């Protein structure tokens, strides 16, 4: 054994004799620490001399190796670890003071000379450390007997892996925290401090308990009206407290409180309040009433009496019996409220219930006459009447005409408060207003299949300052969008969701696609866009409302003094992108991809060049509405007596292509996008396999052929070569269409939708084919409602 067999350094203290105070080989230098030297001094390995559990383990392992005659391993083990050593003299003294097990005495006559003789107090098989070693040895032997191919498999690797749970929870940075930025979580810090300090309300001992701080804090975050809060604690008042002397105590627990009055009987009359408190409260409430477009109360009760029924939450009014509004304790009652100008009668959002410190009431401004029309500006009849009869429109607005519409009294509709923007895009509110027809403006009705007028109608009047006649001021129109930025922010979110999110529905569509092709490289003439889903996380109703709102804003700009061309071009760009995705076309950054997938049925229009060009294009929208009204008055016999119920919003919206308004009365003409017979035969034979007699499936979105020209017109309009190629292909397609129209029998085998005398395509095809067309999977290509193509 070399000098490194025993791991002791020069000058270090070797193992002692377990409290005997004698160093076994302290007189042996480092150069003399060899196996011969140790043997001459009769050193042995003993578990009794172990200083710690590590040395105890090494001693038993060494004993186990020697006992089982693993001499080579024991020799290597003795070189690498530090085992407890002692001399024979010390062992003799230990034996005298220790009861040893005779079974632990072993014969080491055949031990090699290079090994030390172990002398253990316990046998190796009696120690738990050696039992662990035996278990590991058995496991190692088992692993050595398994082929390497089996060990490399994933199944066997999982057996040796130990699952360790993390101490800290997993914090995913992409997942937002579960915190709702609502009114119930936004509490005034000053109010928190007042509640923490406690109120100065004196309470009689033995009658009521004092409210705890947790009750006050929990109740302070409750921003509901008082009559909807818990009865145990309302606005910081202790249970059983009927009233307080000042209204300030009801609103925010601020100010000095007098001794409250506790009523044992419900029928007992409340004490008389001071006149100054009533006048102060009346002035505050009158200012809140003006925020909803109503006048201040005319008469206040001069007797300063509060009826006992007011404690039960009843607000009595002589002139109005439409509804009774609950009233908080300590507030005055009104004898009369002007019914002609008030929109708050019967509404649960009265200032008494919400309190004057409500942020919705503080940010509320008087609605204009146009916003009081409650969504009627989306109706084309109403817009035409406004243009043809401006004096009548001015007369109506001068009279401040009111309509009994649910959203007229709602604080989140028709307001300039940016915090209420989310209400305007709420699909639940849209379904509520679309559930039944309501009277709007000029006698028109909205149905469940039409775009939401309740949630979208007022949207166009929500941005920008307005004059007394309801039209936007041109000086503040673009600035309002720059300041509020609400619509553009929502549109940006929608764009990001549409372009960046790869949803599970997209993968499902790829699996179910019979051609196993993606929509971006698939010919649009063979796409079944009903099976193409919207991206996960986007709302169809939101996209529809966004399109409707942008179209309303553009239509509204005609009655105003103009609109910034740059701003309107941004509108058109976003509308075109939203419409293309709604129709299933998706977004493409390279405009040349459009030619690869669409063929020759494309033409690009130039963007605005001047404000005069913009005005001319806007005037074409009005004429298109008139043409639509004439076409939709009488049903046509060519389409089976079916009348096309098209809403004007999409009528004008789909005429927008490449940043320019295009006037077209024949919007659904089959000449745009219809391939000839040779192209059909080639397409059917290559993509459908062997059967050419299948019905040809045109794109479900019949708006794509003529109106939605480009995927990214901002790039295409700048590429002159692309525009030139598009015009050239357009001329070629026109010749093909003329030939196809001259010989209609050439396309008789294809059930491409016919058009009536007005140029409007019928969803059910020609007269001879009354049934709906189906694709190879049996799915209907043409729904009953043509707006289902836009997921509307």
Swiss-Prot record:
Residues 1-34, 197-377, 397-477, 624-707, 734-792 are annotated as: Disordered. Residues 311-325 have a biased composition (Basic residues). It comes from the Eukaryota. Residues 285-294 have a biased composition (Low complexity). Its main location: cytoplasm. GO terms for cellular component: cytoplasm; nucleus. Residues 1-16, 197-233, 355-377, 397-424, 444-458, 468-477, 646-707, 743-767, 774-783 have a biased composition (Polar residues). It is found in: Cytoplasm; Nucleus. Residues 428-437 have a biased composition (Basic and acidic residues). Residues 53-85 form the LisH domain. Transcription factor that regulates pseudohyphal differentiation, invasive growth, floculation, adhesion and starch metabolism in response to nutrient availability. This is Transcription activator MSS11. The gene is MSS11.
